Regions:
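Phosphate-binding site recognition
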Residues: 1-306, 310-311
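A cross-kingdom feature that marks ATP-driven nucleic-acid transaction machinery
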Residues: 268, 276-426
Length: 426
């Protein structure tokens, strides 16, 4: 029976590792594409097939290559894995139609299994959309996402629960990053050895990633830098980045969203057409890099590692973590109420009486009930003042239940009061 699978997700998220597990455990042909064009990639795939079959030949077209594989699949089970297929899509506009024709006229009645993968998420999702050549052709597809805080913590089980939140806030849930963390060392020691020290594995990761994906690294870097340092509205980002054109900035942002670096967040209850939106740096390592490293490049060159960390990062790390803590708390609620949650997100509005913007960390509809949560990454337990503050924020909303998340617990713990230990006790 023919199968056509599509595996996609941002770079470093573990697609190739998963495909190589299939290659290792099953009778498979594996080929990694590059951006050197159709002919080069055809020659490369031909060589891989020839080695697999143990015969010496080349094919003049993908049609002839798959004709041969279809014949072989009548007597043996064959899985063909084409990794980073989006490189081919970038360099050849016809490859989607070529593949469609091969599937429709050669593979549908064969026993061949074909799996393609891609790191350019937007390109894959566009290729699968209505009226595109590959629409409706896949028998299975899987988007690989970075781990959430809970799954990421399995890479550093020996860390305290507070440090698990800190590790996630800096390194996120991309397996390539989390796999490098040494949980016998502190967060500070890992940041120094993995990011700050000369020759550290992630010292140039952000710029390398951008150079692989975009042409104008400097402009994209300025946009990410603006967001990481507080600009969240389109106008603000356009001005602070120096692009000074919201239309152009919007196009840059769209690609950064596609790459999984930036996200567009809508206020709770708003539709996807709403203008009540903000932009945030989604990838934690990117956010850390542009918050602490990029804008202090000169100091990093002059100072030694310990002095740089103590001067630039140490005092502000927990402030940095507090923002990510809200995301961790949202993901906790998604896990805890996975079967009954209807909507969850940050909520902001303008209070006309106070003449200022009000933000609620988490609003949630679960099992037809409305909830509001306050998240505090502070060294003090949550007490009356913070609870009273949230009550005032939602005073205009009827039938709402309140809850709290705290790094250091509560003066009085009620049913919907969660501390850091609760986050990892699911």
């Amino acid at each position: 029976k023919f199968e056509f699978g599509i595996l996609y997700g941002q770079k470093r998220v573990g697609k190739t590792r998963l495909l190589l597990e299939i290659f290792k455990n099953y009778n498979s042909i594996y080929n990694l594409c590059n951006e050197m064009g159709l002919e080069y990639n055809l020659k490369q795939l031909s060589d891989v097939v020839a080695k697999y079959i143990n015969e010496s030949f080349t094919f003049d077209s993908f049609d002839l290559l798959f004709d041969y594989l279809v014949k072989k699949s009548k007597t043996q089970k064959i899985i063909v894995i084409i990794d980073e297929f989006t490189y081919l899509m970038k360099t050849n506009n016809e490859i989607q139609s070529i593949l469609q024709n091969i599937i429709d006229h050669k593979l549908l009645n064969s026993n061949l299994k074909l799996i393609i993968s891609g790191s350019h998420v937007g390109m894959i999702e566009d290729a699968l959309s209505y009226q595109k050549p590959l629409y409706g052709r896949s028998t299975f597809k899987m988007k690989i996402e970075p781990f959430d805080y809970y799954d990421a913590s399995k890479f550093y089980l020996n860390a305290s629960n507070e440090d698990k939140v800190r590790f996630y806030s800096v390194f996120g849930g991309v397996p390539f990053y989390t796999d490098k963390i040494d949980d016998s060392l502190s967060v500070e020691e890992n940041v120094k050895s993995l990011i700050i020290e000369d020759g550290a594995i992630f010292e140039d990761e952000v710029n390398f990633f951008l150079s692989q994906e975009v042409r104008s690294v400097a402009t994209y870097g300025k946009i990410i830098n603006a967001i990481a340092n507080g600009a969240t509205r389109l106008n603000e980002i356009s001005t602070k980045s120096g692009v000074n054109n919201t239309g152009t900035t919007s196009k840059y942002l769209d690609l950064l969203i596609t790459l999984g670096i930036v996200e567009k967040e809508y206020s709770f209850g708003e539709s996807l057409n709403s203008k009540k939106t903000i932009y945030l740096v989604k990838d934690q390592l990117f956010r850390f890099f542009f918050r602490f490293i990029e804008k202090h490049k000169t100091q990093k060159v002059i100072m030694n590692t310990d002095y740089f960390y103590d001067s630039i990062i140490k005092e502000y790390l927990d402030e940095f973590v507090s923002f990510e803590f809200e995301k961790v708390c949202r993901d906790f609620l998604k896990r805890k109420y996975s079967m009954t949650i209807e909507e969850i997100g940050r909520y902001w509005y303008n209070d006309k009486n106070l003449k200022k913007d009000i933000e609620i960390d988490i609003m949630m509809i679960e099992n037809k009930k409305l909830y509001a949560f306050e998240c505090k990454w502070s060294d003090k337990p949550i007490g009356y003042n913070i609870k009273n503050n949230l009550e005032n924020k939602v005073a205009h909303i009827d039938n709402i239940t309140l809850g709290y998340f705290s790094k250091k617990g509560f003066e009085e713990k009620d049913e919907l009061c969660f501390d850091v230990n609760d986050l990892y006790n699911l």
